[in-house]
């Protein structure tokens, strides 16, 4: 068995005499060990891995070591696409998928260069008043042939290739410019929320980039909200907490996105010094009838308020969901039940008719 580092965080393991069964068992052992927490000083850190497996002499199209490595890379990409801490075997179908992946990366680079990306904005409502408090900026790809492409089709590949940092920077610039324009038109905008990828957050210079963009756009920092996932923070907790402090010193708002879906740590949450928690739509979807979702939602709202944080619920689609959330004193809500994401010039600033104020409370559970 031979282990070698290919570069960055990628390693290759060559095992002679291994069939599919032994390779699977080895992959599972490696994943189990890497999923265990490890300690550096007094810090508990978590890691994960994805494993791509290729068997030789199958498939027969392998002519050299370079082809074998390309096949292994295709299997690795498949594993990453399936989620964290998993493995995947190479198949001939993956060769076609790898070709499509290369084509997508090339097209995405062109999209950045040729201005094919667009921002749509989803309103975030004050559940008590039914009025718009802010917006979440969501990127779309206006492909010249395929039309409007949703982020789920290209964001994963952007994260994999590193293009996500350039996309994040573009989104920040455009969102700040749009917010400044709305304020100049007299709209009562509280904030514009922008998702920050783990890659951009981890480069350590996010505060400098944000300060530069704010200065160029003329937008006051208090109108910008940065949404950061727990997974971005746990990669280097100490450095993340320092960066969060620097961002807060700029005056921007900070929110933890998809709270409860990753490695949630109450001790870390206490130290983060953020302003909001966002309840993932996976917990909202079952409201108000799913007892587990209801219990989790109540607990998160209570925890956040006890820590002095505001709460945003994502994925609200029905009046019953909005009524339940308001009855639990959830502060803000967004979802298709209120409004779908729209271009900046198509926003309806009218109060929501879905459910708010006394109308919500009278039907709350």
Task: Go through each PLM region and give its residues.
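C-di-GMP signaling machinery
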Residues: 58, 74, 78-120, 128, ...
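Catalytic core of bacterial c-di-GMP phosphodiesterases, primarily the EAL and HD-GYP domains
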Residues: 87, 127-136, 161-239, 315
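Active-site core of bacterial EAL-family cyclic-dinucleotide phosphodiesterase domains
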Residues: 89, 100-157, 195, 256, ...
């Amino acid at each position: 068995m031979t282990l070698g580092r290919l570069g960055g965080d990628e390693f290759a393991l060559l095992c002679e005499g291994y069939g599919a069964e032994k390779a699977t068992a080895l992959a599972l052992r490696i994943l189990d060990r890497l999923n265990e927490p490890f300690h550096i000083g007094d810090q508990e850190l978590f890691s994960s891995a994805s494993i791509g497996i290729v068997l030789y002499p199958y498939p027969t199209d392998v002519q050299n070591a370079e082809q074998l490595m390309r096949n292994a890379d295709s299997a690795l990409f498949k594993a990453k696409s399936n989620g964290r801490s998993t493995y995947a075997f190479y198949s001939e179908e993956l060769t076609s998928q790898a070709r499509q992946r290369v084509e997508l990366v090339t097209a995405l680079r062109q999209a950045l260069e040729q201005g094919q990306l667009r921002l749509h904005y989803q309103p975030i409502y004050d559940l008590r008043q039914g009025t718009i408090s802010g917006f979440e900026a969501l990127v779309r790809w206006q492909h010249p042939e395929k039309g409007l492409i949703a982020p789920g089709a290209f964001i994963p590949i952007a994260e994999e290739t590193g293009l996500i940092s350039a996309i994040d920077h573009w989104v920040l610039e455009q969102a700040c410019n749009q917010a400044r324009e709305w304020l100049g038109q007299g709209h009562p905008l509280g904030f514009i929320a922008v998702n920050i990828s783990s890659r951009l957050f981890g480069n350590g210079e996010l505060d400098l980039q944000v300060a530069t963009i704010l200065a160029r756009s003329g937008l006051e920092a208090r109108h910008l909200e940065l949404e950061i996932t727990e997974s971005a923070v746990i990669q280097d907790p100490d450095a993340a907490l320092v960066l969060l402090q620097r961002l807060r010193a700029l005056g921007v708002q900070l929110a933890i996105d998809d709270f409860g879906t990753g490695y949630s740590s109450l001790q870390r949450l206490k130290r983060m010094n953020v302003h909001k928690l966002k309840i993932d739509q996976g917990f909202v979807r079952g409201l108000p009838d799913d007892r587990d979702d209801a219990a989790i939602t109540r607990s998160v709202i209570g925890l956040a308020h006890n820590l002095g944080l505001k709460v945003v619920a994502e994925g609200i689609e029905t009046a019953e969901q909005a009524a339940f959330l308001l009855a639990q004193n959830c502060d803000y809500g967004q979802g298709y039940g209120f409004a779908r994401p729209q271009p900046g010039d198509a926003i309806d600033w009218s109060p929501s008719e879905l459910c708010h104020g006394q109308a919500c409370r009278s039907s709350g559970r």
